[in-house]
Amino acid sequence: MAVVATLRLSAQGTVTFEDVAVKFTQEEWNLLSEAQRCLYRDVTLENLALMSSLGCWCGVEDEAAPSKQSIYIQRETQVRTPVTGVSPKKAHPCEMCGPILGDILHVADHQGTHHKQKLHRCEAWGNKLYDSGNFHQHQNEHIGEKPYRGSVEEALFVKRCKLHVSGESSVFSESGKDFLPRSGLLQQEASHTGEKSNSKTECVSPFQCGGAHYSHGDSMKHFSTKHILSQHQRLLPREECYVCCECGKSFSKYVSFSNHQRVHSGKRPYECGECEKSFSQKSSLIQHQQFHTGGKPYGCEECGKYFSLEGYLRRHQKVHAGKGPYECGECGKSFSSNVNLKSHQRIHTGERPYKCGECEKSFSRKPSLSYHQRFGRPRWVDHKDRKEFKTSLGNIVKSCLF
């Protein structure tokens, strides 16, 4: 790398960080986009980590190398103007990342992005330094974009990535990274709501730092209360946690998984009573029975009638039980149909909606009106100067000659 070659030329004198850093003016900095500023920050942190690993430090002569908490530099300007309130020999404009970030990235804006977080070091990638946001993005490069999955893989993943808490730092055993918990919170994802599997994963509540924080690993969303987190998990699709070892198909419910296994085992517990054929699933048996019943698979054991829907069969079975499905709330009588029930209820209410257009009589049932119009009222018929009067019995009661 060009930076390494530059640092190796330090035999004649001390190499300063300004030799490898790029300086922007205020006008140039304002023209940069947010993505360009983040890229510039990452490159600066990488150069800073490289100088730290090679032992190249800038500062007062014969002074010991700084600790992790401070870095000593000299400014690039001709006049070595110290930061206000700080010694000219030791500049600490930013306590989190060292003074060079305060000089280049403008101390006020840079400190506002820290939120009291520290740099994280990844040993697997050459001791590179990252802040909290970039470190978790870099961490996902080792373990994939979704480090916590809401299925059986999640339980195996949590067991494989053993997280040990010791003081401030935590060790990620899979990639050998040493880092600090994000915002003082060690997130250990629990299993999804409604998930069932043979191997259970204990749900470890996350540590709290100044307040409750609950996170969902799939969407990386954070919630203030555990109740809101549970509601969010119910909206997500359930993971398929039952996997068939024969064909690799996965199922979210154990019932579906058990029915599928009969395909491989050859079990057929459902038999047809007509032709003695057997089926592995009940739905297949019902579909087969339609060939025997003419599209009506639900049959009554009492009288042998078949129905297309199960609800019709239940209603029919109440007839054999001596009780109709429709019961009157006034007298307790039961009827086989809703029409008969409504006609019966008019007896209690006194309603007579059917009226005769000739004699203005009213009836509670339409068949009573039809009977009245046909036989109940007198009707005169002229036939050879005779009029016949028919009664309700249809017989000639009286014959009059005029």
Curated annotation (Swiss-Prot):
Q: Which GO terms describe its molecular function?
A: DNA-binding transcription factor activity, RNA polymerase II-specific; RNA polymerase II transcription regulatory region sequence-specific DNA binding; zinc ion binding
Indicate where this protein resides in the cell. Answer: Nucleus
The UniProt keyword set, sorted, is: Isopeptide bond, Metal-binding, Nucleus, Repeat, Ubl conjugation, Zinc, Zinc-finger
Instruction: Give residue ranges of zinc fingers (C2H2-type).
Output: 92-114, 120-142, 242-264, 270-292, 298-320, 326-348, 354-383
Cross-link Glycyl lysine isopeptide (Lys-Gly) (interchain with G-Cter in SUMO2): where in chain: 177, 200, 253, 366
Pfam families to which the protein is assigned, alphabetical: KRAB, zf-C2H2
Q: List the SUPFAM superfamilies.
A: beta-beta-alpha zinc fingers, KRAB domain (Kruppel-associated box)
Q: Where is the KRAB domain?
A: 15-91
The record's similarity note reads: Belongs to the krueppel C2H2-type zinc-finger protein family.
The role this protein plays is: May be involved in transcriptional regulation.
- What is the name of the protein in this document? Zinc finger protein 587B
Lineage, please? Eukaryota, Metazoa, Chordata, Craniata, Vertebrata
Q: Provide the gene name from the record.
A: ZNF587B
